């Protein structure tokens, strides 16, 4: 109760990789110089939200190139996500999911964001939405992750209300 969510899909968008130009840090705007693409839109949304869950398919035992380009630019251009809880989820056909989870979780850990756990690895198995719907254990893990994220957000709010 009291937790709002928004889903933002980037899978069909062309996401440019970070060039390492450093202009986002030099201009002190907390935005990438590539303009109002999905990265800058989400950065703006992240300023207003309290937590983040990132999902990716697994490609060659790693997160997709699109999501890593997205996260590279998002996290490099702003340091304003500290203490906002984060979680990663991955979807794969067979193997490589734990390596992809570790890759995504590093974005949170390197930016002082508490990791939100579940009852098991935050992954589902299947190539299609229909196959994923048959992964009952994976779906249970996702529900637990959602409850844990809500608990973490409420705990942080309670702490703030008491001066912590």
Regions found by a protein language model. Give the residues of each.
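Helix-loop-strand module that forms the ligand-binding subsite of alpha/beta enzymes
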Residues: 29, 33-120
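N-terminal beta-loop-helix "entrance" segment that forms/cooperates
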Residues: 7-31, 128-132
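Positions that flank functional sites
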Residues: 12-13, 61, 123
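N-terminal beta1-alpha1 ligand-phosphate binding loop
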Residues: 1-3
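Conserved beta-strand scaffold positions in the cores of enzyme catalytic domains, especially
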Residues: 5-7, 115
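Glycine-rich phosphate/pyrophosphate-binding loop and the adjoining helix
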Residues: 35, 41, 114-164
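Residue-level recognition of specific faces of alpha-helices
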Residues: 17-20, 45, 73, 141
